[in-house]
Amino acid sequence: MRLKKLDIQTIKKEKLVQICFYAGILLAFFGSLHPWFLWPLGTLYPLPSGLLIGTAMLISKTTKDNWFTNDHFLAPVMGYVAISTYMLVINETNINGYIVNVFHTAIFYSIFRLKTEKMEAFMTFLCKVMGGLLLVSIPAFFLYLVGFPFVGVDAVYGDDLYSYTNYFLFMIDDRTLWAFFPRFSSVFLEPGHLGTAATLLLSTQFGKWKRWYNIVLLVALLHTFSLAAYVIYVVVIFLKLWVQRKQFIGKLIMMVAFISTIVVGSFFYNNGENLLHDLILIRLEVEDGEMAGNNRVTEDFDTDFEKLCESSAVIFGKKRENPEFGNSGYKVFIYENGIVGTILMLIFYIASLGKIRDRRATASAFILALLGFIVRGYPLWYSNYLTYYDLAHEAPPLPDDAGKKKKEKEK
């Protein structure tokens, strides 16, 4: 009887570890995407997240199946401490920033210590949670488009950088309030943030895209009309085929033909007056040697960036005195953190993603991280980093027979 009682207690402890860790990492993931319901926490979301994860780690030590036994953690933690401390110093952060960074460090430490199979299970859970949220948000958004009277309130975020009408299940950017079809961002700040997050989550679920939560993620991705997310999604498809040692030349030809048909059709359908043409293709037009959709930064910021590159300040970067709306991508990161910060970030990524189980998987994670850095410039956002880390540590693909047996077990 005593043994039976002990087994029950062990099960309860392991379940508590799962609840605390999942809740903590979910909070970190969503906190980095800034949904409206986490705005009150602001940049303090790592505090409750870190406490939950710390609790999970302490309890896990007392169980037979300790979740946090990965021994490749020292170099990644040192790399994170180096880049995060550098960024705090360069951007003249107050003492609160250093306190919050202690909790960020604890969160990253838990990620590096977590067993690979536990991370894979969590990523599937995360996709289900995100899919569940969007499963409610997407229908509500379409009901709004056909005139359903939702109650909305004015919402402002980030010193008036963002202004919305918040309908609670989704938000509408005030700049697109009267648009025929506003881009979908659900409860998050930007369509691009949602699109990129959905794409990266789908990259961890390759071969399982027919499951309900992944279908929902794909539908959400398509309705963000994010050019960057679309491009990354196509790259993900071919990277995953390459990682799994599958022939993709034929698929590449088919996809090019399919995309070409859609593009040509959009120019003729309704004389070019359609969503695909107006929200995506028009941004690919080239004027005066510049692509219309190449608008990651404003002209004023571009001028400031060129001046920075011509001065010695580019070595360490400099703080932006008056951050503007509409600036993102690698230029913003280099402006704020300089060449030294960029090198430290690269070292951190090499240290944390460099434990190779499969060279192709690791290479694909680096390629996606580079694309994300160029487009968004937020390499430490949990919504980005978690997926890169999971992808980099994928095991080599199983032989066909073993792979089929594994799929049958999962079903």
Walk through the language-model features, giving the residues of each.
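N-terminal signal-anchor transmembrane segment
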Residues: 2-64, 82-87, 368-371, 383-390
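Transmembrane alpha-helices of multi-pass inner-membrane enzymes
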Residues: 53-57, 365-373, 379-411
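Transmembrane alpha-helical segments and their membrane-water interfaces
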Residues: 56-61, 89-143, 345-351, 355
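Hydrophobic alpha-helical transmembrane segments
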Residues: 81, 121-171
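Alpha-helical transmembrane segments of multi-pass inner-membrane proteins
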Residues: 127-148, 176-225, 231-242
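Hydrophobic transmembrane alpha-helices and their immediate junctions
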Residues: 234-241, 250-253, 336-374, 393-395
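TM-adjacent membrane-interface loops and short helices in multi-pass inner/ER membrane proteins
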Residues: 289-325, 339-342
